[in-house]
Structures are given as structure tokens and as C-alpha cells.
Amino acid sequence: GNSIGDAGLSTINIAYPITAVLQSVGTGIGMGGSVKYSILKAAGNEKKAREFVAGATWLMLLFSAVLTVTVFFTSEKILSALGASGELLTLGNEYIKVIALGAILQVFGTGLVPFMRNYGGSLWAMIAMICGFATNIALDYTFVWVLGRGMYGAALATIIGQGVTMAVALVYCAIKK
């Protein structure tokens, strides 16, 4: 938001609660699912544990779809309720519509990390998150400063960064299954 000035930074601050909800849905499903997975696995019920992982994955997919549609089509109303108006509403809407289209990346990016930890991959969970953060930072600079894509570029960098986290997590989880 800084390259756009005060309006860009204000937009990120007003829109962040929406992004936080997307990430918290993934984290909630991932944390709850990974705890149940560990309980079942510790009890010796490997089959049930794997079924629970599959169920949590489907739940993340379902919530991703619902959140994508809901946030995309109600973004202006949500932003208005959060206090956006005028230029902030316009910029926020531009930002959140991109974020909404990448909801699946946000939900899975945060939702798979707890499973990685419970598969014994705490280091890989950290690596996945660092890869996502680094990608976001590099692409923020590229999209916003170099290419001048503004809020659209900032949002695109965010969802691509989450996509990188998700990709590393998916590869790790697929190998461990």
C-alpha cells in the first residue's frame, strides 16, 4: 500500500479483516483436523485418521468455494461495514475481489500447515511459510513498485504467496501419505 500513499496503506488496513477471516477458516479447519488426526493415529486407528484428513480437506474445499462466492459478490458491502468509503472503498474492492478469487489458496495455504507438523514436518511447515512470505514480498515489490499495478498487484502477490505455501504443503503431505 505504501507506493500508493496513505490511501493504499489505509485500504490494506481496512481490508485486512477479510483476509484474516479467510486465513482463520483454513487455520481452524487445519488445526482441528490435525489434532483429531493425531488422536486417532495415537490410538492406532490409522485408517480413521486418514479418513479424517480427507474430510478436513473436503471441508477446506467447501469453505473455499463458499467464501470465494460470498466475499467476491459482497465485498463492497463488507468493506462499507468496515468503514470504507470513497477512494478507500474503490481501492478496497479492487484488492478484495482478487483476494476472494484466491480464497482457496489462502484457506489451503494456512490449513495444510498444521497437518505438515503432525506428519512430523515442523521444519518443512516453517519452510513452506517462509517460501510463501518471501514470494509475497518479492512479488509485492515487482507488481506494485516495478510494474505499477497498485492494489491489484498487492492482492495478486498475496494470493500467489499463499499459493506457494500451499504448493509446498501439498507436495510434503502427498509424500508423507
Q: Which positions does each model-derived feature cover?
A:
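Short, non-helical or kinked segments that cap or interrupt transmembrane helices
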Residues: 120-127, 151, 155-156
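Short alpha-helical transmembrane segments in multi-pass integral membrane proteins
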Residues: 37-104, 138, 146-177
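Membrane-embedded alpha-helical bundles that form the substrate/pore pathway
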Residues: 16-27, 94-110, 114, 129-136, ...
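Recurrent gating helices in multi-pass secondary carriers
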Residues: 3, 68-72, 133
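Interfacial/gating helices of multi-pass transporter permease domains
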Residues: 1-20, 87-91, 151-154
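Small-residue-rich hydrophobic transmembrane alpha-helices
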Residues: 9-69, 106-125
